[in-house]
Amino acid sequence: VHLTGEEKAAVTALWGKVNVDEVGGEALGRLLVVYPWTQRFFDSFGDLSSPDAVMNNPKVKAHGKKVLGAFSDGLAHLDNLKGTFAQLSELHCDKLHVDPENFRLLGNVLVCVLAHHFGKEFTPQVQAAYQKVVAGVANALAHKYH
């Protein structure tokens, strides 16, 4: 991902304020509610029968935290996202058979959640930088599919 120095600074500054537990669970939960077909990858998570059930599901929250932990690793290696996400790409492609479009959807949901949490601080410029990052992460995760 090519970010200007200003964009990198904006991404890093905001990410330092992110509560990974809270934002991760909310982002994954929203993905499962807004795009219900993504739930098929989470059969073992128990009750996903309603938006409330999804958003309060401890397994959704725990996996969301794990997902954002990996995203944090990516932010530390923006110049090598493909390498950073190679193993996760392989896992999601070969073993889990996740549609790579879901990575793009989750990235966009994450941007929405960040906008919700940070309000005016999440300026159009910050959003533009984050859109570049989530697109880069989605492409890296989809790399094994190509």
From Swiss-Prot:
Modification S-nitrosocysteine occurs at: C93
UniProt keyword annotations, A-Z: Acetylation, Heme, Iron, Metal-binding, Oxygen transport, Phosphoprotein, S-nitrosylation, Transport
Gene Ontology cellular component list: blood microparticle; haptoglobin-hemoglobin complex; hemoglobin complex
Positions of post-translational Phosphothreonine modification: T12
CDD domains linked to this entry: Hb-beta-like
Ranges in a coiled coil: none
Residue numbers of N6-acetyllysine PTMs: K59, K82, K144
GO molecular function, one term: haptoglobin binding
An annotated GO BP: hydrogen peroxide catabolic process
Positions that bind heme b: H63, H92
Positions of modified residues (Phosphoserine): S44
SUPFAM superfamilies from the UniProt entry: Globin-like
Domain Globin: from-to ranges: 2-146
Functional description taken from the UniProt entry: Involved in oxygen transport from the lung to the various peripheral tissues.
Family affiliation: Belongs to the globin family.
Protein name: Hemoglobin subunit beta
